[in-house]
Swiss-Prot record:
Part of the 30S ribosomal subunit. Contacts proteins S3 and S10. Transmembrane segments: none annotated. Belongs to the universal ribosomal protein uS14 family. Zinc-binding uS14 subfamily. Zn(2+) binds at residues 24, 27, 40, 43. Keywords: Metal-binding, Ribonucleoprotein, Ribosomal protein, RNA-binding, rRNA-binding, Zinc. The lineage of its organism: Bacteria, Bacillati, Bacillota, Bacilli, Lactobacillales. GO terms for cellular component: small ribosomal subunit. Binds 16S rRNA, required for the assembly of 30S particles and may also be responsible for determining the conformation of the 16S rRNA at the A site. Disulfide bonds: none annotated. The gene is rpsZ. Binds 1 zinc ion per subunit. PROSITE patterns: RIBOSOMAL_S14. PANTHER family: 30S RIBOSOMAL PROTEIN S14, SMALL RIBOSOMAL SUBUNIT PROTEIN US14B. This is Small ribosomal subunit protein uS14C. GO terms for molecular function: rRNA binding; structural constituent of ribosome; zinc ion binding.
C-alpha cells in the first residue's frame, strides 16, 4: 500500500506534463500499472478472476 501522502500528491495536477505518472487507483502502487484500467497487475488479476472487469477473461489457446 502506498502512503496516503503519495496518493494525495498524485491526485494534484502536475506542474509540467512530464511529471505525471500512473498509480493504481485501488492500492496506489506506482509500478506495473495498466493505463487502460488504471490498475496494477496484482489488482487487475484479482478483479479479473472475480469477473469484476467487464470484457476480461482468462486466455486459453
Amino acid at each position: 500500500m502506498a502512503k496516503k501522502s503519495m496518493i494525495a500528491k498524485n491526485k494534484r495536477p502536475a506542474k509540467h506534463s512530464t511529471q505525471a505518472y500512473t498509480r493504481c487507483e485501488r492500492c496506489g502502487r506506482p509500478h506495473s500499472v495498466y493505463r487502460k484500467f488504471h490498475l496494477c497487475r496484482i489488482c487487475f488479476r484479482e478483479l479479473a478472476y472475480k469477473g469484476q472487469i467487464p470484457g476480461v477473461k482468462k486466455a486459453s489457446w
